[in-house]
C-alpha cells in the first residue's frame, strides 16, 4: 500500500532517537536526529544569545527549535511514594485533570504534582550562551538542577510533611532548613528547588522568548498591597494551562482582578511569595562579599564550592547586570535600571545576607519577576512572605496513569 508522505502531519520537535526518511543510492533509509547532529556538527543546531548589550530587555533570538524540544521533554507528572519508592505518571500536556493515557486524575491530593526537568546542556562565555538543551555541547556544561521540581509552592499536611499540590495554600513562616526537613519526610531524595534550577529556568526562558521582561511576556502574577490575601489564594489556578506558559484571570472581592502565572508548567514562580533557593550561600571576607555555589541535595551555610564576588548592598533597585559567565550564573551584579529596562526585576542585598530567595511577593509589584533576587537575610530567618518549592533528586519509575492510581 502506498503512503503519501506529504499528507502526513508535520511536527515541530524531535527526540534524538527519532528518525528522518532519506534516500541513499536510490533506496529509502532512516537517519536519527542524533546521528544527523553528529554529521552536521554542533553549531548548526545550537542557538546562541548575547545579553546586556543595551537597556532594551528584548534581544536577538535565533530559532527556538532547541528550546522547543527541551520543553517538550519536560511536562507535568503525578508522583507518588509507595513503600519508599517513587513512581511517576505523565499528565496530559494540555489538561492536567487527565493523565497522558487518558485516565482522569482521581484525586490530586494523593500525589505530588511535579515537572520533569531533564539534564540541560549549555556552553557559555561572558554574556553569551549557547543552548544545547537535551543535547551535549563539546566543552559545555549541565545546569546542576534536580530533574524533578514541584509545579506548585510547598504546602504542608497535618503532619508537617511538604507537598506540591493544587487546591491548598502555600506554607510560609518557615526557615529554609525547616522546609528542607519537611521535604525529607517524603524520602531522602526529596529536597528543595535549588540555585541550579534557577539558573536553568532563567536560561530556558531567555532562549524561548528573547525578552527579559517576564511580567510583560508571561504575566504580572499577583500584585497587591493585600499581599497576605494573595499568598493565601489556593494554588492550581493555572491548571488549565497544562505544561504551557501564560496567565489566567483570578478575581475575588478582596483582590479584584489578579493574574497568576505559569512558566513551562511551574505555577507562580513570581508575584505570590518569595521562594528559597539553596545551593548558594553568601559571606563577607573583610570588605568583600562572596557567593559560594555548592552541590547536592542539601541546605547549608558552610558547604564548600566555587565562589565569586557579589554586591554587598542593594535596596530593591532594578537589575542591570548578572554574573553569567561560564556557568551562566543568574545572580545579579549591578542595579540601576527600571521596570522596562535590562532585566526589569528588583534585587536586594546586605552584608549580613546569607541565603537566596527569588521571585518576589505580591507586595513587590513590578520588582517581581523571574530574575528578581534577594540575598538580604540571615540563614535562620523565617517570615510570613517566605516559601519554597519541592524537588526530587532521584529517578522515579515511570508508569501509566491507571497504574499509578492503582498503587
Segments the model singles out, each with a brief description of its role:
Residues 17-24, 265-267:
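Short hydrophobic/aromatic-rich beta-strand motifs
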Residues 24-27, 120-122, 153-156, 280-281, ...:
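Acidic glycine-/aspartate-rich tracts in secreted/extracellular proteins
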Residues 199, 220, 225-235, 244, ...:
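C-terminal, surface-exposed recognition/capping segments
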Residues 283-295:
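A short, polar/charged loop-to-alpha-helix boundary motif
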Residues 1-17, 405-407:
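Short, intrinsically disordered N-terminal pre-domain segments
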Residues 22-41:
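Short, surface-exposed terminal/edge motifs of secreted or surface/virion proteins that either
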Residues 42-116, 122-124:
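GGW-centered surface loops in extracellular recognition modules
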Residues 104-111, 131-269, 273:
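Short aromatic-cysteine micro-motif
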Amino acid at each position: 500500500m502506498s503512503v503519501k508522505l506529504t499528507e502526513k502531519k508535520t511536527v515541530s520537535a524531535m527526540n534524538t532517537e527519532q528518525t528522518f526518511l532519506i534516500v541513499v543510492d536510490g533506496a529509502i533509509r532512516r537517519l536519527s536526529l542524533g546521528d544527523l547532529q553528529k554529521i552536521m556538527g554542533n553549531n548548526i543546531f545550537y542557538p546562541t544569545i548575547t545579553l546586556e548589550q543595551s537597556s532594551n530587555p528584548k534581544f536577538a533570538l535565533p530559532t527556538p527549535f532547541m528550546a522547543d524540544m527541551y520543553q517538550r521533554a519536560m511536562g507535568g507528572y503525578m508522583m507518588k511514594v509507595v513503600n519508599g519508592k517513587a513512581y511517576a505518571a505523565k499528565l496530559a500536556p494540555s489538561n492536567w485533570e487527565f493523565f497522558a493515557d487518558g485516565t482522569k486524575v482521581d484525586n490530586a491530593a494523593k500525589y505530588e504534582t511535579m515537572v520533569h526537568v531533564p539534564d540541560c546542556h549549555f556552553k557559555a562565555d561572558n554574556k553569551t550562551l549557547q543552548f544545547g538543551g537535551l543535547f551535549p555541547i563539546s566543552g559545555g556544561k549541565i545546569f546542576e538542577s534536580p530533574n524533578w521540581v514541584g509545579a506548585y509552592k510547598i504546602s504542608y499536611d497535618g503532619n508537617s510533611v511538604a507537598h506540591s499540590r493544587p487546591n491548598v495554600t502555600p506554607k510560609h513562616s518557615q526557615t529554609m532548613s525547616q522546609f528542607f526537613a519537611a521535604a525529607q519526610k517524603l524520602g531522602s531524595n526529596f529536597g528543595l528547588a535549588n540555585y541550579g534550577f534557577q539558573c536553568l529556568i532563567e536560561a530556558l526562558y531567555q532562549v524561548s522568548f528573547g525578552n527579559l521582561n517576564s511580567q510583560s511576556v508571561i504575566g504580572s502574577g499577583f500584585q497587591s498591597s493585600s499581599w497576605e490575601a494573595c499568598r493565601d489564594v489556593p494554588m492550581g489556578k493555572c491548571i488549565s494551562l497544562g505544561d504551557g506558559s501564560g496567565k489566567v484571570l483570578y478575581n475575588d472581592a478582596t483582590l479584584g482582578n489578579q493574574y497568576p502565572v505559569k512558566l513551562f508548567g511551574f505555577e507562580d514562580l513570581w508575584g505570590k511569595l518569595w521562594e528559597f533557593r539553596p545551593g548558594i550561600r553568601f559571606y563577607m571576607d573583610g570588605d568583600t562579599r562572596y557567593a559560594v555555589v555548592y552541590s547536592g541535595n542539601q541546605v547549608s551555610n558552610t558547604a564548600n564550592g566555587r565562589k565569586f564576588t557579589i554586591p554587598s548592598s542593594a535596596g530593591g533597585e532594578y537589575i542591570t547586570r548578572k554574573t553569567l559567565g561560564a556557568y551562566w550564573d543568574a545572580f545579579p551584579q549591578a542595579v540601576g535600571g527600571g521596570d522596562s529596562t535590562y532585566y526589569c526585576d528588583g534585587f536586594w542585598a546586605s552584608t549580613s545576607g546569607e541565603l537566596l530567595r527569588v521571585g518576589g511577593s505580591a507586595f513587590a509589584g513590578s520588582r517581581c519577576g523571574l530574575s528578581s533576587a534577594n540575598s538580604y537575610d540571615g540563614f535562620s530567618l523565617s517570615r510570613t512572605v517566605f516559601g519554597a518549592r519541592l524537588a526530587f533528586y532521584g529517578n522515579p519509575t515511570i508508569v501509566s496513569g491507571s497504574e499509578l492510581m492503582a498503587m
